[in-house]
Regions:
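Paired acidic/hydrophobic, glycine-rich loop segments that form the ligand-binding mouth/hinge
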Residues: 4-11, 119-123, 139-141
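Cytochrome P450 core scaffold surrounding the K-helix E-X-X-R motif
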Residues: 20, 149-151
Length: 194
C-alpha cells in the first residue's frame, strides 16, 4: 500500500505482537512495514475461578500451585493467545508451574472453569465480566497495572502477589504503512484523540 495516509491498519495483539514472535515466517514485519498512529484500546484479562472453588484469592492459587507443581490448570483462548502468554507470565513471575489447557476461544474455557474441569481461566474482561457480575465466577485478579472501575474490589496481579511489573492486556490501535509522512501521522493521531 502507498504510504499516503489513505491505507490504515487496525492492528492488535495477535497478528502484530504475538505472531511475529511465534511464527518464523510471516508476509510482513510489523516493526519494519508499519508505523503506529495511535493506541485506541487496552483490554485487561481477569483471572477467574468457579464461585464455589476453594481458591479464594490469587495468593492462595499460587500457594496451591507451589504445593502441587504442574497439577493446577489454567485455561486460555488457545495456544499462543494473549491469555496463554498471560498465564505463562504469571507462572514465571510467581515461581510456579501451572498446566496450560488451550481452548478455541474464551467461551469454552469459561464453560470448563464453571464446571471445575480446570482451576482457572484468563478471559478478556469483556468475555468474563458477565459471569463475574452474576456471581458464577470469582475474579482473583485483573492483569492490568490498575484496578478496573467495573471491578473495584478485585486487585491487580501485582497487588495480589506483592510483585511489581506484571501486566498482560490485549490491545488495538491504528498503524499506517512505513514511509507515511510524520505530518500525516500527527494529524491522524490528533483526530483520533479528539
Amino acid at each position: 500500500a502507498q504510504p499516503d495516509g489513505y491505507t490504515v491498519l487496525m492492528a492488535n495483539l495477535g497478528p502484530n505482537a504475538i505472531n511475529p514472535a511465534v511464527y518464523g515466517r510471516l508476509p510482513y514485519d510489523t516493526l519494519k512495514d508499519f508505523t503506529p498512529v495511535v493506541l485506541v484500546t487496552k483490554v485487561p484479562l481477569i483471572i477467574v475461578t468457579a464461585a464455589n472453588s476453594p481458591v479464594k484469592d490469587l495468593r492462595q492459587l499460587v500457594s496451591l500451585a507451589k504445593a502441587k507443581p504442574g497439577q493446577i490448570t489454567f485455561g486460555s483462548a488457545g495456544n499462543g493467545s494473549g491469555s496463554h502468554l498471560a498465564g505463562e507470565l504469571l507462572s514465571t513471575m510467581a515461581g510456579v508451574k501451572m498446566n496450560h489447557v488451550p481452548y478455541k476461544g474464551d467461551a469454552p474455557s469459561l464453560t470448563d472453569v464453571l464446571g471445575q474441569q480446570i482451576n482457572v481461566a484468563l478471559p478478556t474482561s469483556l468475555a468474563g465480566m458477565p459471569q463475574v457480575k452474576s456471581g458464577k465466577l470469582r475474579a482473583l485478579a485483573v492483569t492490568s497495572k490498575t484496578r478496573l472501575p467495573s471491578l473495584p474490589d478485585v486487585p491487580t496481579v501485582d497487588e495480589a502477589l506483592g510483585i511489581n511489573g506484571y501486566e498482560a492486556v490485549s490491545w488495538g490501535g491504528f498503524m499506517v504503512p512505513s514511509g507515511t509522512s510524520q505530518a500525516i501521522i500527527a494529524k491522524m493521531n490528533s483526530e483520533f484523540n479528539k
